[in-house]
């Protein structure tokens, strides 16, 4: 793992969290219980404080940063998709930020909301509970349905379960030179499938 103290502030990581060895945590970063931090994520707390609350996930290649005297927060059970950028914003409890979305300074994403992939949420945006946001700039297009929220929660549970799986079975290795016969497939822990 790449942890760096900055001007006397050391990242805080709960012992039940999983931080991938290629992720980088710098300075004023607080990671809660059962959190998953994916490969190549960068949590750069060299200005503002970064807080990832219990059960949330920050997936591969995500960036968190913010200005001085601000907190960038991912609420409990928050779900931050691959490549998303969070800068000085607040992601509400049980919300999802889709892949490669950008959430700017002072923006607040409401609880149980979903930000569609590739969306751009402008600085100062104030979302409400259970909104589906999409576009550039993002706007609320409708409410999140019960089925969509259930789907989001299944995906988040997969990452919460992945924390324990990684603690138990992830290790560095050398590659095989050819694929073995009857190579098994990995299985998730829920029946979640991609949204179509």
UniProtKB/Swiss-Prot annotation:
<keyword id="KW-0677">Repeat</keyword>
<keyword id="KW-0808">Transferase</keyword>
<feature type="compositionally biased region" description="Polar residues">
    <location>
        <begin position="187"/>
        <end position="196"/>
    </location>
</feature>
<dbReference type="Pfam" id="PF00132">
    <property type="entry name" value="Hexapep"/>
</dbReference>
<dbReference type="GO" id="GO:0016740">
    <property type="term" value="F:transferase activity"/>
</dbReference>
<protein>
    <recommendedName>
        <fullName>Carnitine operon protein CaiE</fullName>
    </recommendedName>
</protein>
<dbReference type="InterPro" id="IPR050484">
    <property type="entry name" value="Transf_Hexapept/Carb_Anhydrase"/>
</dbReference>
<dbReference type="InterPro" id="IPR001451">
    <property type="entry name" value="Hexapep"/>
</dbReference>
<dbReference type="InterPro" id="IPR023446">
    <property type="entry name" value="CaiE"/>
</dbReference>
<comment type="function">
    <text>Overproduction of CaiE stimulates the activity of CaiB and CaiD.</text>
</comment>
<comment type="pathway">
    <text>Amine and polyamine metabolism; carnitine metabolism.</text>
</comment>
<dbReference type="GO" id="GO:0009437">
    <property type="term" value="P:carnitine metabolic process"/>
</dbReference>
<feature type="region of interest" description="Disordered">
    <location>
        <begin position="173"/>
        <end position="196"/>
    </location>
</feature>
<comment type="similarity">
    <text>Belongs to the transferase hexapeptide repeat family.</text>
</comment>
<dbReference type="InterPro" id="IPR011004">
    <property type="entry name" value="Trimer_LpxA-like_sf"/>
</dbReference>
């Amino acid at each position: 793992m790449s942890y760096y103290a900055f001007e006397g502030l050391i990242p805080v990581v709960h012992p039940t969290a999983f931080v991938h060895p290629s992720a980088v945590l710098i300075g004023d970063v607080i990671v809660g219980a059962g959190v998953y931090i994916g490969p190549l994520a960068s949590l750069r707390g060299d200005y503002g404080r970064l807080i990832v609350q219990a059960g949330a996930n920050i997936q591969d290649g995500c960036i968190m940063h913010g200005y001085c005297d601000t907190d960038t927060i991912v609420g409990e059970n928050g779900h931050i998709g691959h490549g998303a950028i969070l800068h000085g914003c607040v992601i509400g409890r049980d919300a999802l930020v889709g892949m490669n979305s950008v959430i700017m300074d002072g923006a607040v994403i409401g609880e149980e909301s979903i930000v569609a992939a590739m969306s751009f949420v402008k600085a100062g945006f104030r979302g409400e509970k259970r909104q589906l946001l999409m576009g550039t700039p993002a706007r609320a297009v409708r409410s999140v349905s019960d089925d969509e929220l259930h789907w989001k929660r299944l995906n988040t549970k997969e990452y919460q379960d992945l924390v324990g799986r990684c603690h138990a079975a992830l290790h560095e290795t050398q590659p095989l030179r050819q694929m073995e016969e009857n190579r098994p497939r990995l299985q998730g822990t829920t029946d979640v499938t991609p949204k179509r």
